[in-house]
Regions:
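Glycine-rich beta-strand-centered segment in the early N-terminal region that forms part
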Residues: 22-36, 50-96, 135-137
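NAD(P)H dinucleotide-binding glycine-rich loop of Rossmann-like/cofactor-binding domains
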Residues: 91-171, 200
């Protein structure tokens, strides 16, 4: 099979290679990949900015596909069923995190795309227990967005616990930021603002508007704190979701959130140390939570939202490429002048 492989450590070293179709174990299934999305993680591995990965490895973890083969002890699935899969591969099942329903935090976890071979290929194998059925009304194309939507669900619903009536500001117009903003509206937020900078004005801020986020702000031209103060009678935002990972935006979150408010952090900085106005968090007595990965209930929630059309991400996908055109696809994902970039396998 054809696969896009990170062959060794360092910037670049990504190439199409002929790889064997995965051999499945008794508790696994083989999946024919239909669509698979480029995530920031894939970009960071490509540029050698992701802290952990084990080359040679097939990249990719956001996918939708069809079961074509079952392990001998798999009885809960049939060939031909359409599925998506969680990323908690190789978890131990015995540690405190696994036994309390948080396999995403297991130290033994090796996710597809960095720890084990991923979905930028014709086929991927997955443990049967990590699969979710795609509702009949949801296309393979849209289902490929389940993983980033589940990550967004974890940040907003499970970690930040957004409430009806909250004034929410989302910092960052990448796919995750836009999905979180849409989910905040679904949750009944009184207002949702999403912010970008000059480079986002001609595309991503407009894309957010197209996807139903009316209040878009270019913080390169608008004083965000003054704007939030005007809209909240000087109180500040109830919840700020930081989805950029850049230092100015992180500090902006501390400026615009209200006293006793919440900051949810999902953006991953490119550097390990930042200059953050920590005292503002202390004096405001803020709730600060970080979010990474997703849980079972996030996947079931997202698929139900897709099924009943409460969450429609059709327009978030702006570019599709064949795997052979991976260089163009990665260029488009890196230049931030698009929404979600998918490979159609």
């Amino acid at each position: 099979m054809k696969a896009l492989v990170k062959t060794k450590k360092g910037k670049g070293f990504l190439e199409i290679k002929e790889m064997p179709v995965p051999e499945i174990n008794y508790d696994e299934v083989l999946i024919k990949v239909h669509y698979t999305g480029i995530c920031g993680t894939d970009v960071h591995i490509f540029t050698d900015q992701f802290p952990i990965y084990y080359p040679p490895v097939i990249l990719g973890h956001e996918f939708s596909g069809e079961i074509v083969k079952l392990g001998e002890k798999v009885t809960s699935w049939k060939t031909g069923e359409r599925v998506v899969g969680e990323c908690q591969s190789l978890v131990c099942g015995k540690c405190r995190f696994c036994r309390t329903g948080h396999p995403e935090a297991c130290a033994a976890k090796r996710s597809p795309g960095w720890g084990i071979n991923g979905s930028f290929a014709d086929y991927i194998k997955m443990p049967a227990w990590l699969l979710h059925k795609i509702p009949d009304s949801v296309s393979y194309r849209e289902a490929a967005l389940t993983e980033p939507a589940a990550v967004s669900s974890q940040a907003l619903y499970s970690r930040a616990k957004v409430s009806t009536g909250d004034f929410v500001v989302v910092l960052g117009t990448g796919p995750i930021g836009i999905i979180i903003a849409k989910m905040a509206k679904i949750a009944g937020a009184s207002q949702v603002l999403i912010t970008g900078i000059d480079k986002d004005e001609k595309y991503r801020l407009l894309l957010a508007q197209k996807l139903g986020i009316e209040n878009t702000v270019n913080v390169s031209k608008v004083n965000l704190k003054e704007m939030v103060d005007d809209l909240t009678d000087g109180i500040g935002a109830d919840l700020v979701v930081e989805a950029t990972g850049v230092e100015p935006a992180i500090n902006q979150a501390f400026d615009i959130v209200r006293k006793l408010g919440k900051i949810a952090v999902i953006g991953v900085p490119g550097q390990s140390r930042l200059n953050v106005n920590w005292s503002a968090g202390s004096f405001k007595a803020l709730d600060l939570c970080f979010s990474f990965s997703s849980q079972y209930e996030d996947w079931t929630r997202v698929l139900k939202l897709f099924e009943n059309r409460a969450l429609d991400l059709t327009d978030l996908v702006t570019h599709e490429f064949k795997l052979a055109d991976w260089k163009m696809a990665f260029d488009k994902a890196i230049d931030c002048q698009g929404g979600k970039v998918l490979f159609k396998i």
